[in-house]
Amino acid sequence: MPLACFVLITLTTFGCGGDSPLTSPTPSPTIPTISTVPAQSPTPAVCPEDLTEERADTVIFGAQAGDFLADRFSLTSGDFNGDGFADVLVGAPLADGPANDRTDGGEAYVVFGGPSLPPVIDLAERAADLTLFGQEADDNLGFTVASGDVNGDGVDDVLAGARFAANGGRASVGAAYAVYGGPDLGGASDIADGQQDLTIAGDDAGDYWGFALTAADVNGDGIDDVILGGSSADGPGDERHDAGSVAVVLGSGELGGRIDLGLDPPHLVVHGARAGDTLPNFMAAGDLDGDGREELLLGAPFADRGDPTKERAGAAYIVHVSDTAGSLDLASGGGFTSIVGADRRDGLGFFVATGDVNGDGIDDAIVGARDADGVDNERGNAGEVHVLLGSPDLPPSLDLAAGSLDATIHGVDTTDSLGFTVATGDLKGDGVQDILAGAPVADSCGNSRSDGGEVYTIAGGTSLGVALDLADGGFMRLLYGAEAGDELGFSLATGDIDGDGRDDIIAGSLLADGPDNAREDAGQAYVVLSR
């Protein structure tokens, strides 16, 4: 099949292989706009300005059918070899290990950035610059990946979660691993041979520690800390089934070896508010109150806060991490801001991100609600993305039913699921973060490709509007999935891969089928350079 049918649409564009222009509507006056396109238009004869195989910047093909390269939490970037270029870190949680003898053990790959990446990186034909192998069959290593300097040497480290890893005969406790970055990073690291620098193992069977994973400096010491989620942990005293928990393990120059959460209490444990919340579905971190330390942004899309009218409305939490070790219970007490979804089954918090999108020097919270129903609730499951601007005066609670946050971005069509993934990055090189939003089940290219998927980029800046309906345009760039069922936007990240001072888009198509459609559901990841 052709590589992903991404699209860069300018104010006047021409169909790929054709010469009839498409005229864009008037851009939204509230959002700075580089280029727009009619988001709901008759199906074109050809997808405007297709990014065909010849025009792709870089595509990474999963090695084998069914690997699920670029799963939902399996994509990020970081400078892992310290050369000044961002590198791609992508997981394949259903890959089968070094000799294909660990079914679904999982793998994670690092592809080094540089001034010119090859247009095609086929993991079946060439090894990644670094490959991590899961320890045992069914571990699902690479279901989550993250980056951060957790040992304080100035170079980003590779982090990968294995949500189904066992610990001492306890099944599916989950684990997270780190391989420390540096100029000599490369080759292979097999968890079965102890070739990782750090292991954090869960404690109770079925907790799924490593389901979510990030790194951030939450205590302000200049070293990133490891934050991992156990989405099915059962809360204080194991009395809240599947409430979920988050553990903070402080980074340091001495961090390494093996940490067992059952024997070595972490710095902080955050407990989900109610049974079934499965905190965190995803998490991010940023300095959301401007105090110089990063707060946690935790998503709980199945939360209802005990209100039957809010069934699965979802919630997101901004958690301030104390210097004092201990626990924080989201069912009571302070130390956090809660954001509650507007309507039942909105799924607020399905994906979250942080970044300074209005340029005031304080990070902002970006929260996806993949099942929200759009403008006036008239587009079922179109999806929404909500923006809460950071501030030293964050309130203790916010309910979207009482009014929107500082900005809301609405999906175009019913069942698009905008906000399934979100990310931020400085795509324009102006020092302000822009917003990226994935809609992996959108019918791309004028609704001609069922579930082809789409990715939108929205310009950040001081004129970021209160509401943006993507059906009216107002976005910078629109990327289209190549074929029906590819689900472009299933994963999403940014990083300055080519070192030009602008972040580039990294997007995954979980169900793409590899070269010539010969590897069903191998998965693909794409690097789309900012221009």
Where are these regions (language model features)?
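Hydrophobic beta-strand segments that make up the repeating blades of beta-propeller
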Residues: 88-92, 158-162, 226-230, 296-300, ...
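Bacterial signal peptide processing site
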Residues: 17-20
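Short glycine/acidic-enriched loop and turn motifs that connect beta-strands
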Residues: 95-99, 164-169, 233-237, 303-307, ...
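Blade-edge motifs of beta-propeller repeat domains
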Residues: 34-68, 107-140, 178-208, 245-278, ...
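Blade-level signature of beta-propeller repeat domains, shared across WD40, Kelch, NHL, RCC1
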Residues: 455, 490-494, 505-531
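C-terminal motif of bacterial Sec signal peptides marking the signal peptidase cleavage site
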Residues: 12-15
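Beta-propeller blade termini
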Residues: 70-85, 91, 142-155, 210-223, ...
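A detector of repeated loop/turn-to-beta-strand junctions in beta-rich toroidal repeat architectures
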Residues: 102-107, 170-175, 240-245, 310-315, ...
